[in-house]
Amino acid sequence: MKVLWAALLVTFLAGCQAAADAPIKVEQPVEPETEPELRPQTEWQSGQPWELALGRFWDYLRWVQTLSEQVQEELLSPQVTQELTTLMDETMKELKAYKSELEEQLSPVAEETRARLSKELQAAQARLGADMEDVRSRLVQYRSEVQAMLGQSTEELRARLASHLRKLRKRLLRDADDLQKRLAVYQAGAREGAERGVSAIRERLGPLVEQGRVRAATVGSLASQPLQERAQALGERLRARMEEMGSRTRDRLDEVKEQVAEVRAKLEEQAQQISLQAEAFQARLKSWFEPLVEDMQRQWAGLVEKVQAAVGASTAPVPSDNH
């Protein structure tokens, strides 16, 4: 299918667009005869993306219009309508993008003119979209009718479809012509608006250019002064700046020294306070535990004396009973 599209696109770009179909023989599907030229496609084809997309849709419609055996087989499946839907969406997308681009160029044009042109272009765009949708609907209807008449003769349906497609192709050609003309008007308006915008910019830039000339003349007069005088003035300014910075640096160093001395004094004072608090706490602990230690020593001494007395009593000699 892609190879066939490429061949049809080459024919499309060469300007070999035909508008009328040759009659189809009802005995059996055959390749159509060469169609007479209705209008050379190059008259409205300018290479815009939307026109190229419309050309692909056009060539695909020509291929469908042949009603060859391959077309007959694919018309019974949704592939053809899906391809047409894709080509329709692509065409309308490119057309909307081109329209948006022209609308940006129309910004300097009067609002009333821009609204009128946009309304006319939208109407032509809607007609083209409706006719493309009509083509797709006809093919869907044909597929449904053929499927309903399986096993019966479909020659009348094919002849009727061929007639409808010829009419739709003529309508599409008229829509494309109308759309191309309105886009040309749209583009002319955009070009005129752009020229007005350039004139307005030139008027605004005039004073700025004059100011630039005055400034350049001032710079030129300064450049004519002796180089030694300018260097001396620059040296004086640098010297004054360095002296000012040195004075500020010395003042800042003095402030830092004073702050460091204050911090050192505070740290020494806090260290002394901590030392005194530690000595007081040590004395307090000593006063707490000394009575307890003395009491424990007394109790221990008494316990030792009692043990010694008990041991001495148990070792004393027992008197004998010999008389």
From Swiss-Prot:
Residues 1-18 form the signal peptide. Sequence repeats lie at residues 86-107, 108-129, 130-151, 152-173, 174-195, 196-217, 218-239, 240-261. Keywords: Chylomicron, Endosome, Extracellular matrix, Glycoprotein, HDL, Heparin-binding, Lipid transport, Lipid-binding, Oxidation, Phosphoprotein, Repeat, Secreted, Signal, Transport, VLDL. GO terms for biological process: acylglycerol homeostasis; cholesterol efflux; cholesterol metabolic process; chylomicron remnant clearance; high-density lipoprotein particle assembly; intermediate-density lipoprotein particle clearance; lipoprotein biosynthetic process; melanosome organization. Heparin binds at L168, R169, K170, R171, G235, E236, R237, L238, R239, A240, R241, M242. Belongs to the apolipoprotein A1/A4/E family. This is Apolipoprotein E.
